């Protein structure tokens, strides 16, 4: 895949900010490596820096603590996956070093870095070198506007609604699970993520899942990320016998 100029700039900014992520938590925004013209306005909440999820449930529930509204065929597939996992944990797609995919990527045990710019927000996950670029200059993603194909992490666009970053993503393939227990999804999956800074060191995420092939209605789940101080990233390379 050819890297466009925005991706290149984002990767450069990500590299520059990795070393300063810990300092940013204590000293406020650190925009080293980001040109002045691309820095977010001072009035915008600063979600940049390193984050981790202190509590990582294996099975994702809805915001009211219930099982997602699976359709009959999806429920049968879910139950099969759970039975297979009991027999052999390596039936999990990530055992073959595949990306975690949507939603589940936030529940892995490795930290992530958020790079915040005026026109783009980038999520750089230590897990398996996974990254997401969220374009803030376009409307909701449309797959029929070019030659895009389905991918593990989809195509994301975002916007700020007051103090909340709203990210719309679609264009996923169906090769990943939504959580560690085997929740399925298909290629019609669309996600809406809302990220709200609750305080300087707490970021709340609310994700709404819409997938008419697997769920009878849209459903939402939530999680909490905590800012990391003195974060020193390490290289995380998946190998066939690696447990993520």
Task: Indicate where each model-derived feature is located.
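Bacterial N-terminal signal peptides that target proteins for export
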Residues: 2-12
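Bacterial N-terminal signal peptides
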Residues: 10-20
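PEST-like low-complexity, intrinsically disordered acidic/proline/serine-rich tracts
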Residues: 24-244
């Amino acid at each position: 895949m050819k890297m466009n100029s925005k991706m290149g700039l984002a990767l450069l900014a990500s590299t520059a900010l990795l070393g300063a992520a810990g300092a940013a938590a204590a000293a406020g925004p650190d925009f080293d490596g980001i040109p002045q013209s691309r820095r977010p306005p001072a009035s915008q909440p600063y979600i940049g820096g390193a984050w981790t999820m202190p509590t990582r449930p294996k099975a994702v529930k809805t915001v009211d603590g219930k099982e997602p509204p699976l359709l009959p065929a999806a429920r049968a597939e879910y139950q099969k996956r759970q039975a297979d996992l009991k027999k052999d944990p390596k039936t999990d797609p990530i055992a073959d070093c595949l990306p975690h995919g949507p939603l589940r990527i936030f529940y892995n045990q490795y930290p992530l870095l958020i790079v915040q710019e005026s026109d783009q927000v980038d999520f750089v996950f230590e897990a398996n070198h996974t990254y997401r670029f969220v374009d803030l200059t376009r409307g909701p993603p449309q797959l029929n506007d070019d030659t895009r194909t389905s991918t593990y992490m989809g195509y994301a666009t975002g916007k700020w609604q007051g103090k909340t970053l709203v990210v719309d993503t679609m264009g996923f393939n169906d090769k990943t699970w939504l959580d560690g227990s085997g929740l399925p999804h298909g290629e019609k999956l669309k996600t809406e993520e809302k990220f709200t800074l609750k305080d300087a060191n707490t970021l709340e995420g609310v994700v709404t899942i819409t997938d008419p092939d697997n769920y009878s209605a849209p459903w939402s789940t939530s999680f909490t990320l905590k800012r990391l101080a003195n974060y020193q990233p390490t290289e995380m390379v998946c190998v066939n016998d690696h447990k993520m």
